[in-house]
Amino acid sequence: TTEWQKGYQNLRNVNYFFEYYKVPETEETKDVLSMKGEAYFFRAYWHFYLLTRFGSIPVMDRFWDGNATVGGLQIPPRDRSAVAQFILDDLNTAKGLLHSRSQYKGLRVCKEAAIIMAMRVALYEGTWEKYHKGTDFAAAEDKSADLLGQVLTLGDELFGMGLALNTKATDKNAVNIEDAYAHIFNSKDLSDMTEVVFWKKYSIADGVIHNLSSNLGAGYVDNSGPAGLSQSLVDNYLNADGTPINPADGIFKDFNLTFKGRDGRLLATVMHSNCKFKSTSPESKSKAMLVEEYSEENKQIVRPPYLTEGGPARNATGYHIRMSIDT
């Protein structure tokens, strides 16, 4: 399959690095070793990519070109639990080589990213083995207790590394409590947000750009279909006090009241009245979004968020994404 090919092509690229890495120990500076740690990180990443899609797989732990014969390529798969442990071992090696986030402000793979990745792998495989025991998809040996224990151990290590959540108290640009959450997704520079351990910096001047904000503002995510957040997603957000909502309550028939007293992350994620709709186009002089009940009197000022457009530029639900647009 395409995913199988993608995973192993990327693993070959990483192992090509290991095959031709010839730096003498005396010249292995901390910067050189950190780059070596990045290779271990990505070898773990692509094995995890394959594990989550296929389960037990052949482990590509070396450069295979010397075995590029019909017989040499018949590498038997390892049990999924052994694959997971191989991934965790690579991430542990990466952790010991990588710089901390502070060195490059999150612009390169860092020690903290390796720990978080290891937690994700251990949690994924641990829960898989726990809940698939006795099925055709079970690991040969149930190691869920050990894997889930590793999550706790790694978490304790991560908590001592000085990362901090981006909150209204720490974010000088946050006016409302939800702003700090939104800024994680719509800020141009995440250097000082230590909660973001690995990110990519975009710059028009440097030619590093993307179209996501423009696409989302126009009502679509990609060219394959219309956008629109689902009702069930909106219903899953709690009230600000942590209690769940009852979607059957009459208050939620009113679009504006739907957002009253709700978790700030809902307000940061979904367009509602007073948001700057499609603010990614400065020349349009966008006004704040206004949602009112339709009538003949106000039909000129109330515009639905692309409900009636055609093709992919259409919102299929009426819940238009705000995250990464209203900046």
Feature locations, PLM:
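Short amphipathic alpha-helical coiled-coil/interface segments
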Residues: 39, 43, 118, 151-155
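Short, conserved phosphate-binding/catalytic loop or strand-edge motifs used
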Residues: 60-68
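Conserved, well-structured interaction surfaces
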Residues: 1-54, 70-106, 253-255, 260-261, ...
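An aromatic- and glycine-enriched ligand-binding surface/loop that stacks and positions planar moieties
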Residues: 1, 57, 61, 91-93, ...
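Aromatic-lined, polymer-binding surfaces characteristic
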Residues: 105-114
